[in-house]
């Protein structure tokens, strides 16, 4: 496993890490026992960074991480997120009192005294522009309750704005082969400013695994069913903003990336790990098999310059126009 510095922080994070949205719920049926085994397998392979949020299973994914990382607090870094347990448009959600309460609850569930990275969870742009939430986070950092803070953003514009805040240590962005806009300006600027990039939705909610056909039916409690057209939250969080049927067709046109790399999942993750400025990529998982498959991405061959250019042109000519939502 290769480790990258998360921006200017002193955190060295595994280039392949994991997100825990799926094991908290919202991705259909999950098993705690299987999730704990999967977390153990990831850590055994050298994964030292996990991303979670207070709303993933109403805190359940944080509780699972507490169990899995007991006794390993100094070596396993955890990033959590806040604001979506409240009204994201209400400034009171971002007050010192509210944010401190969210943090204390997360720390209690995680059974930790300090959080390595605390991220604002896709707030509206007006909240970021207001700026007071950054002052609150500065205070929590001074108090030693968090080591660093960052922002999970929905758009490149929001990301560029956050890069002007001197104490923002990381940005979490939707980024995959079917959603490449951050490469143009956001990643180079983040690198220049010394801000780490955490790539989320790397498989476009499973589209880039190649396992779906257009008639696939998701469970009703899976966001790929209830948010497929952005009914519940930003459409970009589900299938990277692509209509499902179109996404399946586009993914199939990328089937060639699996040659010499085992499968499309590993290829899609490797492609992200190859992009300059990306600190870590955080695919989700539900079981040991998925973790093991994702871990193989570290070992597969790099993309050649010709292949990278082919993927860039494909995105520009075939994909970009079909992406919906704020981007």
Regions found by a protein language model. Give the residues of each.
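N-terminal binding-site loop/beta-alpha segment at the start of enzyme catalytic domains
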Residues: 1-76
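Short, well-ordered coil/turn segments that N-cap beta-strands
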Residues: 11-16, 46-49, 72-76, 112-116, ...
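Active-site mouth loops of central-metabolism enzymes
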Residues: 21-33, 85-100, 125-126
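Short histidine/acidic/glycine/proline-rich micro-motifs that form metal-
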Residues: 24-25, 54-56, 84-86, 122-126, ...
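Short, acidic/polar
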Residues: 30-42, 94-110, 154-161
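A short, structured active-site edge motif that brings together acidic residues
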Residues: 75-87
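Active-site groove signature of glycoside hydrolases
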Residues: 107-126
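Beta/alpha (TIM)-barrel catalytic core signal, keyed to glycine-rich beta->alpha loops juxtaposed to Asp/Glu
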Residues: 123-316, 327
């Amino acid at each position: 496993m290769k480790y990258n510095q998360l921006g200017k922080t002193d955190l060295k994070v595994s280039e392949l890490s994991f997100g825990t949205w799926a094991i908290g719920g919202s991705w259909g049926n999950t098993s705690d026992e299987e999730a704990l085994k999967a977390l153990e397998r990831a850590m055994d392979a050298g994964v030292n960074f996990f991303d979670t949020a207070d709303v993933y299973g109403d805190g359940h994914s944080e509780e699972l991480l507490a169990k899995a990382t007991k006794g390993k607090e100094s070596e396993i870094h955890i990033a959590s997120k806040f604001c979506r347990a409240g009204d994201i448009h209400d400034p009171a959600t971002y007050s010192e009192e509210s944010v401190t309460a969210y943090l204390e609850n997360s720390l209690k569930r995680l059974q930790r005294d300090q959080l390595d990275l605390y991220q604002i969870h896709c707030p509206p742009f007006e909240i970021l522009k207001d700026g007071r939430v950054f002052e609150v986070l500065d205070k929590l950092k001074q108090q030693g309750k968090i080591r660093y803070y960052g922002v999970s953003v929905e758009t490149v514009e929001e990301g560029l704005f956050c890069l002007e805040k001197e104490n923002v240590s990381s940005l979490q962005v939707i980024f995959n082969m079917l959603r490449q806009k951050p490469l143009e300006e956001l990643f180079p600027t983040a690198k220049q400013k010394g801000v780490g990039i955490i790539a989320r939705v790397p498989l476009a909610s499973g589209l880039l695994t190649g396992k779906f056909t257009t008639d696939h039916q998701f469970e009703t409690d899976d966001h790929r069913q209830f948010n497929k057209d952005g009914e519940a939250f930003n459409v970009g969080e589900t299938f990277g903003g692509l209509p499902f049927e179109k996404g399946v067709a586009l993914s199939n046109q990328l089937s060639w990336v699996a040659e010499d790399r085992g499968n499309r999942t590993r290829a899609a993750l490797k492609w992200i790990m190859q992009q300059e400025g990306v600190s870590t990529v955080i695919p989700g998982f539900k079981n040991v098999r998925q973790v093991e498959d994702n871990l193989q991405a570290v070992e597969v061959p790099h993309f050649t310059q010709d292949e990278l250019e082919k993927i860039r042109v494909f995105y520009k000519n075939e994909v970009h126009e079909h992406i919906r939502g704020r981007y």
